[in-house]
Amino acid sequence: MKQFEFGAGLMMSISLMSFSLGNPPLPLTAKTASAAESQTVLPPLLQRELFFGDPEITGAQLSPDGQFLAFQKPLDGVINVWVKGIDEPMEAARPVTADAESPIMIYFWSADGRYILYGQDKGGNENFHIYAVEAKSLGGTSPVTRDLTPVEGITARIYSVPKRTPNHIIIGLNERNPQFHDVYRLDLTTGERTLLIQNDENIALWTTDLDGNVRIGYRQSLEGGHEILAVQKDGLTPVYTCRIEETCVPIRFHKDGQRVYLISNRDGNLIQLKLLNLESQQSQVVEVDPENQVDFGGAVFSQATDELIVTSYVGDRIRIYPQNDKIAADLAFLKQQLPDVDIVLQSLTIDDRFALIGTRSDVNPGSTYLFDRSTQTLEKLYDDRPELPREHLATMQPIRYTARDGLEIPAYLTLPQGVDPVNLPVIVMPHGGPWGRDMWGYRPFTQFLANRGYAVLQPNFRGSTGYGKAFLNAGNNEWGTGAMQ
């Protein structure tokens, strides 16, 4: 990895008081003598709406049977859900929701593909309800949306969408006690709810097996850490615990129904993928970062067999590890067809034949493709922001620098196009969260600043997630002072 020496050609400027975004410090057109003499051409000044406006299309998902494609797109200026037949052009899509006030940010298909389900609150009150709309009834002039949780003052959660009972989902409602969610089975056709578990044990999260049976509870322990509990006939039994400075979270049941996948760093520095046997309470490591650099990033499971097929890690960029030969061949094909981008598997059909593939990069806000795994063919569906000229965007480079106490800090540096990287004004832009690390890729505010002549440094300072337990906890008692500052 290339090392950057900030003193050699890049002047760091921490204070932003002298910066004026309305009056950029660098020339922004090629009509000056200095620009004309430059070896490179300055990019045009791009309007902020191109960076910060709603994407034209985003968030596509295949129906389980592969016959339809849903995605998010503005309707009268508000993000809603649209659906089209898989063989239809994107222009033939019809809206199936018509929220005129708040954008629909999260949605998904029911297990049989009959309904689009989504969560929505009113006016930002954070009382999210679950709504359903007939996804394939596209002939009407106005979609009919049903509130499946019509209770005032509650926040609904969706815990599971089991394939084996496609007309039912498992949800949580805090109707009885605003602090905790009881667990219900919800009939998508009638809206009828059946109580499964009354939450009297301060459980924050419930996990079901692949058949929709509630098997795991997750809560904070009295010592400030967390504990995973098995749901049994006579109550809840702790089966795995971690301390306050550690991580342990269940993510999905194994197809054998006896073991559960979880992520944990209880026995090491990096978060690992593990399998926990609920009966023996013994766990085994499934995978840890092959490069021994970062925490476990994510997992993808087959829709057809429920087997683990892909793992991923976020280092300087996303790294993907196929778990069988067929997936390895698919990934090799995709990398050949889609070079120089990070590849994300967005959704799979129930038979694993079709996959939605998302691509991202520092200069690509997002593109989505339909991949037929049986024929090894790839069809581009859309770009998220087609009007944003990628040739005028600035590249983001992973770098490392050494803090005053010798700790190596990972960061990303974005330099404006068309000028030498010497004596540039620099905006240091720490991530929020406050722990959630920055990643390589398109960032609208970063590109907006770079287009106006600023270099942007995004440090993943000590206390950032993703780089192991030691790096995360190195930020304890250092906020705003000490070595972090």
Would you name each region that the model predicts?
Residues A8-S20:
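Bacterial N-terminal signal peptides
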Residues L46-F51, A93-T97, V144-P150, E192-I197, ...:
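A short beta-strand motif characteristic of beta-propeller blades
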Residues D54, Q72-V81, A98-P103, Y115-A132, ...:
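A flexible loop/linker signature enriched in serine peptidases of the S9 family
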Residues G85-P89, A135-L138, D187-G191, V231-D234, ...:
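Short loop/turn segments that connect beta-strands within beta-propeller blades
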Residues V344-Q485:
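Serine-hydrolase catalytic core recognition
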Residues A60-F68, I106-Y115, Y159-H168, W206-N213, ...:
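Blade-terminus and WD-like Trp-Asp/Gly-His loop motifs, strongest in beta-propeller folds
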Residues E49-W82, A355-L356:
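Beta-strand-rich domains and repeat architectures in extracellular enzymes and scaffolds
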Residues E37-I57, M90-A93, A328-V341:
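A short helix->beta-strand "capping" segment at the edge of beta-propeller domains
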